[in-house]
């Protein structure tokens, strides 16, 4: 398997026997009046006025590290100008278009599948997993989900992220632990909601993310709670940045110059735990307000299932609406039980977006 970088995820196909997956539900101070000394006869009497109350000095909130989830929480998002650029395919049940939108000073590209019919249709913004930007093409990743969901009445908008396909480049995206990808998907939703395209239902929007895109989705959920109506993640990376670094860091990679810069600037997780925790979604999962469906295979050796188990446990402890489905024997990309998983996904979105 190809080495994957800081937070990357490669696809690994494992054929597995189908089985019924496991689903988990989801002291008081006293003040005395001042005494006044007796006034001699004939002397004028003056009534003491109230003493001035000192104005408290405002407490300054420490500015978060720019590479942190808190910085994303504080950020203002300006996704807009969703434009359909050209038709690339007509599959009968739906048409596929190249699109762009603006946000964070960048133009981001993507593809959008639009079902035939009058609409308006609910919208799903898809967040793809790690693919080398040098070989990535528009809309790459999750082709089965693209097709199935469009055929079942959903507009599917796949964001390419910055630095991918025709999107504007951001040379610091890797150095910033790919947290800017969450900015791109948040701005994709903002662009949908501000669009005048008549077939988009701005009041019914969800997120779906796979692998690295699962982590992008979790980060977006905590950065902008309430922006979408529901979310689904498949085979997600960990909600702790340190886990992902330890799993995917490969010093011998061509991209290791960035990795060395990260280690030199921020420190390794064991030496700088505060930085790595601040760059993680998990400490902020109590901010999630949307129903969440989590799919994970028990034989995933790219993103171990224990990562989703820990994420789900944290969400449940916070009282969140999360459903966890484990697929016995499935690997990272899903094989025999993919159909079952996408049917659950569609039913989940049908429930929460309709």
Where are these regions (language model features)?
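C-terminal motif of bacterial Sec signal peptides marking the signal peptidase cleavage site
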Residues: 13-15
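C-terminal catalytic histidine-bearing segment of alpha/beta-hydrolase fold enzymes
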Residues: 306-354
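Alpha/beta-hydrolase fold nucleophile elbow
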Residues: 198-211
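N-terminal cap/lid segment of alpha/beta-hydrolase-fold proteins
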Residues: 73-118
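Short beta-strand/loop motif that positions the catalytic acidic residue
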Residues: 288, 294-296, 300
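Hydrolase active-site cap/lid region
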Residues: 218-269
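Short substrate-entry loop that stabilizes the transition state in hydrolases
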Residues: 119-121, 126-168, 240-241
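Alpha/beta-hydrolase active-site loop
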Residues: 175-196
């Amino acid at each position: 398997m190809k080495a994957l970088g800081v937070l990357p995820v490669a696809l690994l196909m494992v054929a597995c026997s189908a089985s019924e997956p496991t689903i988990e539900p989801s002291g008081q101070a006293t003040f005395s009046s001042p005494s006044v000394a007796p006034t001699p006869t004939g002397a004028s009497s003056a009534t003491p006025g109230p003493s001035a109350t000192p104005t408290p000095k405002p407490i300054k909130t420490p500015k978060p590290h720019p590479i942190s989830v808190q910085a994303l929480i504080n950020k203002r998002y300006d996704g807009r100008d969703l434009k359909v650029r050209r038709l690339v395919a007509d599959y009968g049940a739906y048409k596929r278009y190249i699109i762009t939108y603006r946000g964070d000073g960048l133009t981001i590209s993507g593809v959008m599948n639009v079902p035939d019919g009058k609409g308006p249709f609910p919208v799903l913004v898809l967040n793809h997993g790690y693919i080398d930007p040098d070989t990535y093409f528009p809309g790459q990743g999750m082709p089965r989900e693209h097709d199935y969901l469009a055929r079942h009445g959903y507009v599917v908008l796949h964001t390419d992220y910055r630095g991918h396909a025709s999107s504007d480049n951001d040379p610091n995206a890797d150095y910033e632990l790919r947290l800017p990808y969450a900015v791109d998907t948040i701005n994709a939703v903002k662009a949908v909601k501000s669009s005048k395209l008549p077939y988009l239902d701005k009041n019914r929007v969800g997120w779906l993310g796979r692998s690295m895109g699962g982590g992008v989705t979790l980060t977006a959920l905590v950065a902008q709670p309430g922006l979408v109506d529901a979310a689904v993640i498949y085979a997600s990376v960990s909600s702790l940045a340190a886990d992902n670094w330890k799993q995917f860091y490969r010093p011998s990679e061509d991209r290791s110059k960035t990795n060395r810069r990260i280690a030199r600037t921020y420190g390794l997780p064991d030496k700088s735990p505060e930085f790595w925790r601040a760059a993680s979604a998990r400490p902020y999962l109590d901010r999630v307000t949307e129903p969440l469906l989590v799919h994970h295979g028990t034989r995933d050796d790219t993103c171990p299932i224990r990562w989703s188990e820990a994420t789900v446990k944290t969400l449940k402890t916070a009282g969140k609406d999360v459903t966890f489905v484990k697929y016995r024997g499935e690997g990272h990309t899903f094989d025999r039980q993919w159909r079952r998983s996408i049917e659950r996904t569609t039913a989940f979105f049908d429930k929460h977006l309709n």
